[in-house]
């Protein structure tokens, strides 16, 4: 059987027009621009309008990625949508995206891996392409997180923003594409970042709403330590598997959770700040959308050129984490 190499053929991203600045948050919660910036690096985040929903941004990002890949929606045979903020419980957001795109030949599903969702999707799509089960896979990270934050809790409401990013994967020439990909999870840390309401365990009632059970809960100090360790370790693992070191990496795109986390991971990997991409100041934490948005911004700006080695690492609720290294 002929060996198939899988790589990214096209990228895209989309986010709401609405912007929520630190100054806006100062008026609704006990915080300040200085407090937010010094602890997170965030200056503003995108916020969806009440009549906007996750799949709209996913579809816009997907259309960009498909066009840049030089294919048609009908050529897509696999859609993986990473999200923790779906349009609705049933059907999956992936199926809604499929219908809107007209990608009627595709299998579609959602991935619930929080901030690691996009790298989970890349890893699964890479495997499907390599084994011949898919020719063109669409991987999307899309979120409207601002609907799930408690605007009386300054530890969480300042962090999250909305948006979507997408990538089309397909066969590429030998020596290019995804060189190594790994994903991990550890459910023992479930309560470091979670939302207890809305499921069959926590339920959905006037009481759960009054308690704020549908909002994100986070234990920031504990999460920081596990996130830094896990992202650094899995970055080293994928580099070793690919026969590379950090000196080979042209660009490092970590999940945009918090600037302090990004800086700490970069320090552990001993990589220069000039090769670390950060857009958290303008977008905040967009969970599964953060890496694909960052990736597309780097493609659009010319930060990534053919032959460049790009390293991506993520960490999210679950807890989950992942690492992917590729040659563009």
What are these regions (language model features)?
Residues 14, 82-87, 113-118, 141-146, ...:
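Acidic, glycine-rich active-site loops and adjacent beta-strand->loop/helix elements
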Residues 209-280:
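A contiguous, well-structured pocket-lining segment that forms one wall/lid of small-molecule binding clefts
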Residues 293-313, 319-328:
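Catalytic phosphate/nucleotide-handling subdomain of diverse soluble enzymes
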Residues 36, 75-82, 109-112, 135-142, ...:
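Beta-strand segments within the central parallel beta-sheet cores of soluble alpha/beta enzyme folds
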Residues 35-56, 84-137, 267-295:
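Conserved catalytic cysteine-centered active-site region
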Residues 130-164:
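Flexible, glycine-rich active-site loops centered on histidine and acidic residues
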Residues 8-10, 50-109, 119, 241-268:
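Conserved beta-ketoacyl condensing-enzyme motif
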Residues 1-50, 153-225, 229, 233, ...:
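Condensing-enzyme catalytic core mediating Claisen C-C bond formation in acyl metabolism
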């Amino acid at each position: 059987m002929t060996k198939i190499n899988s790589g990214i053929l096209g990228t895209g991203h989309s986010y709401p027009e609405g912007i929520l600045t630190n100054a806006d948050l100062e008026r609704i919660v006990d915080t300040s621009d200085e407090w937010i910036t010094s602890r997170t690096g965030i200056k503003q985040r995108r916020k969806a309008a009440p009549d906007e929903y996750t799949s709209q941004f996913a579809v816009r990002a997907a259309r960009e990625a498909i066009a840049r890949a030089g294919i048609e929606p009908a050529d897509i045979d696999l859609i993986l949508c990473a999200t923790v903020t779906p349009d609705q419980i049933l059907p999956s957001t992936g199926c809604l995206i499929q219908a809107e795109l007209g990608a009627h030949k595709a299998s579609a599903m959602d991935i619930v891996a929080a901030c690691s969702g996009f790298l989970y999707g890349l890893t699964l799509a890479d495997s499907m392409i390599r084994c011949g089960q898919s020719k063109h896979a669409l991987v999307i990270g899309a979120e409207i997180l601002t609907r799930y934050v408690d605007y009386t809790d300054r530890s969480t409401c300042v962090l999250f923003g909305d948006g979507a990013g997408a990538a089309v994967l397909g066969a590429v020439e030998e020596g290019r594409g995804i060189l190594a990909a790994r994903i991990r999870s550890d459910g023992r840390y479930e309560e470091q970042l979670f939302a207890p309401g809305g499921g069959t365990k926590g339920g959905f009632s006037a009481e759960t709403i009054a308690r704020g059970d549908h909002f994100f809960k986070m234990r920031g100090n504990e999460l920081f330590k596990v996130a830094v360790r896990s992202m650094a370790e899995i970055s080293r693992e994928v580099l070793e598997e690919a026969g590379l070191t950090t000196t080979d990496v042209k660009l490092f795109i970590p999940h945009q959770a918090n600037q302090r986390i990004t800086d700490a991971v970069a320090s552990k990997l001993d990589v220069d700040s000039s090769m670390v991409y950060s857009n958290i100041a303008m977008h905040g934490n967009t969970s599964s959308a953060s890496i694909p948005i960052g990736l597309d911004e780097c493609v659009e700006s010319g930060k990534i050129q053919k032959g460049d080695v790009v390293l991506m690492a993520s960490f999210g609720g679950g807890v989950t984490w992942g690492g992917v290294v590729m040659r563009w």
